[in-house]
């Protein structure tokens, strides 16, 4: 009798992918990257195991947003002091720290659990075209669509 294949840490092969964010739409890129980080693009995907690959995103400063999201979408954070709420629009965040904009978007699409945190640590975002991960021999990844 055959049994359903269940992946575990010992039989997972991880790859490194480089994705160029120049000219890509924020949400479409984020959902694709979140899927790669979770391992859903593999036939051996197992929900309770971190089977995803490493992702390097370059040119994060050239990401695009559709519609009026640059001026209307607001990100909030709080300092835990009374009256300590801070806000920044997506356009301001893209100018100030484009890497953080992509990280917030992608990590928001991962599960909010210990497994999701582990999957989020395999994401590396850089504003320019250079990255320090040449030793891992990353492959270029072509996005769908």
From Swiss-Prot:
Q: Which UniProt keywords apply?
A: Ribonucleoprotein, Ribosomal protein
Q: Which GO terms describe its cellular component?
A: cytosolic large ribosomal subunit
Can you cite a GO biological process for this protein? negative regulation of translation
Q: How does it assemble?
A: Part of the 50S ribosomal subunit.
Name the family the entry cites: Belongs to the universal ribosomal protein uL13 family.
What job does the chain carry out?
Answer: This protein is one of the early assembly proteins of the 50S ribosomal subunit, although it is not seen to bind rRNA by itself. It is important during the early stages of 50S assembly.
Q: What is the protein's given name?
A: Large ribosomal subunit protein uL13
User: What lineage, starting at the top, does this entry show?
Assistant: Bacteria, Bacillati, Bacillota, Bacilli, Bacillales
């Amino acid at each position: 009798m055959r049994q359903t294949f269940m992946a575990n840490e010992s039989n997972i092969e991880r790859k490194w992918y480089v994705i160029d964010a120049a000219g890509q739409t924020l949400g479409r890129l984020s959902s694709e990257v979140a899927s790669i980080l979770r391992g859903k693009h593999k036939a051996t995907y197992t929900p309770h195991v971190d089977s995803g690959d490493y992702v390097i995103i370059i040119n994060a400063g050239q990401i695009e947003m559709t519609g009026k999201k640059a001026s209307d979408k607001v990100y909030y954070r709080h300092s835990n002091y009374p009256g300590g709420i801070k806000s920044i629009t997506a356009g301001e965040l893209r100018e100030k720290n484009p890497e953080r904009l992509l990280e917030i978007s992608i990590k928001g699409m991962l599960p909010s659990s210990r497994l999701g945190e582990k999957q989020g640590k395999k994401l590396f975002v850089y504003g320019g075209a250079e990255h320090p991960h040449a030793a891992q021999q990353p492959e270029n990844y072509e996005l769908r669509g």
